[in-house]
């Protein structure tokens, strides 16, 4: 493990003598969620991966830091850069972060730090509250911390000529104190994290990437659950414009920003010849179903090649004509392929909200033309056995093999 990492899970905190009170946040508290529920061995592994992912995110945004410390229930980033809290909050597995001031874990030091922050934070007429918690062995309670720190803030405000008010139910301003065994942390804000599990803890999957709104969101949601992705783009040229290809690749590039330290390998598969065969040989209304089944077969071969465990799609039940329950069954009929639909029950508005959050919305809504292979009246209630009969006209195995011979592997 690099020198920037330290493990203090047994000692709980590092030496307070090297910490100084300088009046500005000098550490970021990183909190994680459900990985804390894992067994000791699994939790230890997850935490180490999370630390590496946090370090990679900080490096990708050119945010300096001196150390990452792993302690029981927390990760601490030693930095004075105000961007660090937001950056760490964008790491999968992190539920929240807080830029904090570090001080000694005694009542006097904590009270002095709270008074300093409170004087600059609380304006005339505003109410305040101290939110205190502690861990480790201390000769005082959390209530003692709150009371002593509150008194110090009150006295400091009175010296400033302000008229302080305490409101523990609905205060205008809050000051948080986390008292640990060897250090105390005082902070004013909590930045919400993306949550989930650390990227890379749940293996890898292939994602069918179209560049529309849905597939990037589906990929991101699986990344949030710890899954590394291998994007597969089926190029429908000449039935699709080059703009569609660039849009898909730009979505992949944006997803890459959520996974610093993990380089995607994008597989581009020529799919136009397959569409030409479907249009020329089969009932026109079945083109979309045959197309999707072929994409699954091609993605399955990529899945086996890269050692992945499944295929991710952006399908959402009932969103378009081809995504009826009957059609989605037909798409996998007699195909023993593990398919994941993370958006299956999402409303379009929910998908749009996530796309905006992750930075793919503006890319996915760029004009890119339409696929001209789509029939005027696509099948919405497929006959499963008829689809299989249609495929027997085509020489499916040869088509899959020809497509994979022409695949391009790209680092975008």
UniProtKB/Swiss-Prot annotation:
- GO biological process per UniProt: thiamine biosynthetic process; thiamine diphosphate biosynthetic process; thiazole biosynthetic process; tRNA 4-thiouridine biosynthesis
Q: Which GO terms describe its molecular function?
A: ATP binding; CCA tRNA nucleotidyltransferase activity; tRNA binding; tRNA-uracil-4 sulfurtransferase activity
Record-listed E.C. numbers? 2.8.1.4
Q: Which UniProt keywords apply?
A: ATP-binding, Cytoplasm, Nucleotide-binding, RNA-binding, Thiamine biosynthesis, Transferase, tRNA-binding
Q: Does the record bear tRNA-binding in its keywords?
A: yes
Q: Tell me the segments the record calls region Disordered.
A: 1-22
Q: Where along the sequence do coiled-coil regions lie?
A: none
Q: Which GO terms describe its cellular component?
A: cytosol
Q: Which InterPro entries match?
A: Rossmann-like_a/b/a_fold (IPR014729), ThiI_AANH (IPR020536), ThiI_fer (IPR054173), ThiI_N (IPR049961), THUMP_dom (IPR004114), THUMP_ThiI (IPR049962), tRNA_STrfase (IPR003720), tRNA_sulfurtransferase_ThiI (IPR050102)
Q: Where is the THUMP domain?
A: 82-190
Which annotated residues bind ATP? 208-209, 292, 314, 323
Tell me where in or outside the cell this protein is found: Cytoplasm
Q: In which pathway does it act?
A: Cofactor biosynthesis; thiamine diphosphate biosynthesis
Q: What does this protein do?
A: Catalyzes the ATP-dependent transfer of a sulfur to tRNA to produce 4-thiouridine in position 8 of tRNAs, which functions as a near-UV photosensor. Also catalyzes the transfer of sulfur to the sulfur carrier protein ThiS, forming ThiS-thiocarboxylate. This is a step in the synthesis of thiazole, in the thiamine biosynthesis pathway. The sulfur is donated as persulfide by IscS.
The family annotation for this protein states: Belongs to the ThiI family.
Q: Which PANTHER family match?
A: TRNA SULFURTRANSFERASE
Tell me the protein's name. Probable tRNA sulfurtransferase
Q: Which organism is it from?
A: Methanosarcina acetivorans (strain ATCC 35395 / DSM 2834 / JCM 12185 / C2A)
Q: What is the lineage of its organism?
A: Archaea, Methanobacteriati, Methanobacteriota, Stenosarchaea group, Methanomicrobia
The encoding gene: thiI
């Amino acid at each position: 493990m690099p020198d920037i990492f330290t493990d203090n899970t047994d000692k709980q905190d590092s030496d307070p003598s090297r910490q100084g009170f300088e009046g500005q946040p000098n550490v970021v508290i990183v909190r994680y969620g459900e990985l804390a529920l894992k067994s000791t061995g699994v939790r230890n592994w997850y935490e180490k991966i999370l630390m590496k992912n946090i370090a990679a995110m900080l490096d990708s945004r050119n945010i300096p830091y001196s150390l990452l410390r792993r302690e029981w229930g927390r990760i601490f980033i030693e930095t004075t850069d105000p961007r660090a809290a937001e950056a760490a909050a964008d790491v999968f597995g992190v539920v929240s972060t807080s830029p904090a001031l570090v001080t000694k874990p005694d009542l006097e030091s904590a009270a002095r730090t709270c008074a300093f922050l409170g004087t600059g934070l609380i304006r005339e007429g505003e109410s305040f509250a101290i939110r205190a918690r502690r861990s480790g062995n201390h000769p005082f309670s959390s209530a003692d911390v709150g009371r002593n720190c509150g008194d110090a803030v009150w006295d400091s405000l009175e010296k400033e000529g302000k008229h302080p008010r305490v409101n523990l139910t609905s205060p205008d301003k809050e000051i948080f104190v986390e008292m640990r065994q060897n250090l105390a942390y005082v902070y004013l804000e909590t930045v919400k994290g993306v949550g989930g599990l650390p990227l890379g803890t749940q293996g890898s999957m292939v994602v069918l990437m179209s560049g529309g709104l849905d597939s990037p969101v589906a990929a991101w949601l699986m990344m949030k659950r710890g899954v590394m992705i291998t994007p597969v783009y089926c190029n429908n040229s000449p039935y699709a414009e080059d703009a569609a290809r660039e849009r898909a690749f730009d979505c992949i590039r944006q997803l890459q920003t959520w996974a610093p330290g993990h380089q995607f390998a994008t597989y581009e598969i020529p799919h136009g010849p397959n569409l030409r065969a479907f249009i020329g040989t089969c009932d026109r209304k079945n083109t979309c179903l045959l197309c999707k089944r072929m994409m699954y077969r091609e993605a399955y071969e990529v899945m086996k090649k890269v050692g992945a465990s499944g295929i991710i799609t952006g399908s959402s039940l009932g969103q378009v004509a081809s995504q009826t329950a009957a059609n989605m069954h037909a798409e996998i009929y007699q195909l023993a392929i593990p398919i994941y639909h993370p958006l299956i029950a999402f409303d379009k508005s929910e998908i749009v909200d996530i796309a905006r959050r992750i930075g793919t919305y503006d890319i996915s809504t760029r004009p890119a033309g339409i696929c001209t292979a789509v029939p005027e009246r696509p099948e919405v209630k497929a006959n499963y056995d008829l689809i299989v009969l249609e495929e027997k006209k085509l020489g499916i195995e040869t088509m899959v093999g020809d497509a994979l011979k022409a695949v391009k592997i790209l680092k975008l």
